[in-house]
């Protein structure tokens, strides 16, 4: 059976359209230039002399740089390693990576926010942006029946829901383990705009440095810049051969790596200045220390979130997650309690997840924003051009044969809903403010209530203290007088008693003052008061 003409033509012409893949990259060495850090822990708080593990002789190691200035090479060609495109070229400047005349490799794109001065990395990025815009233009301006934009590939790129949920769950677990308040109702927020990542230095007591790494690819260069460091004390610092500041008081431990390229396990980074590195080439003049990286999340309580949405003039500062959990780490280190294991393991797990997800999440968000901006600009340009080209046929809608060909922006509905919620909250805030002095007092009650009890106790003590003291003094005085009255008869019984003679009775009618008598006889209380007379009668 004979093949159709168009199938036969396609079969014949197919080899002419086959694209040739770039040659493999030659930035491979077999003399073991790559060595790893391995810290062996004898017991918590003591680090053995750092050793390093080299690959066996003949093991190929691929090395690529994340940034290469334009003045380091005259020409660059594409190469491929592990199904990834790289640039390769010979260095013409002694200060460039590798040295003069050495062939090195670097990534196809440089990291976000960097420029190589108009070199191949900038050109590749500009070419990629033009290709995306051209593809969107072709999809939108096709003359076939209008089917809308196909964003399925973009949706596959932006599937970050699972990674974000895992990141939030890990954060909440670590917060419950190290926070003394153990919050149950809170909001953990991750900003959509770019904010610096937070660096948490690795504690010296951490004993998880013995993980073996098997990798044959090394990326030399900063991965993240403009870091925010939580604290700069008790650091585990790295000392290279050309490190200038080796007496820094911030470092509690110094380790010396080998002179070749060194890399750290997944989840741990070198922090030099305000940049984070996965691998270093064995030379750094600035001080570098070991650190975790965590995203800039913010924790809100319900009241804090309400205050933030209402936008009051003075809002209470909310704690940032790394500082809250970092306080738990520092408290555990200072007091010797068992929080160091949970907090550092949490940081390690969170940093590991961030190590694999931060670039994908950031690239996805940037890609979405760039493509939406490009799509809006391209749609406006194409629509104006199509209206001009199809003006004689009644415009774009009649030319395409559709009743409605206008894009309805649904973001306006979301904006209206958010505005309604803000207006509702604002009305509630105004009602609270219009309730009079109690409205203002209610705002300060959470701050005043903890001090009302001690303040009232002090005032009551100052008012009624003197009265109570006087009552106590009078009570004690009365008790003393009563005791004295009870003791007075006993005291009188011990005094001397006087009597008159019994043989001279006084006249019942006579006055006491008229009686003339001699002084009474003095007798002792021990003698009887009545004595027998001379006749022997009593």
Swiss-Prot record:
Ortholog of the human HERV-W_7q21.2 envelope protein. The genome contains a high percentage of proviral-like elements, also called endogenous retroviruses (ERVs) that are the genomic traces of ancient infections of the germline by exogenous retroviruses. Although most of these elements are defective, some have conserved a functional envelope (env) gene, most probably diverted by the host for its benefit. Disulfide bonds join 186-189, 186-405, 397-404. Belongs to the gamma type-C retroviral envelope protein family. HERV class-I W env subfamily. The mature envelope protein (Env) consists of a trimer of SU-TM heterodimers attached probably by a labile interchain disulfide bond. Interacts with the C-type lectin CD209/DC-SIGN. The keyword Cytoplasm does not apply. The gene is ERVW-1. The cytoplasmic region is essential for the fusiogenic function. Residues 380-396 are annotated as: Immunosuppression. This is Syncytin-1. Residues 465-538 are cytoplasmic.
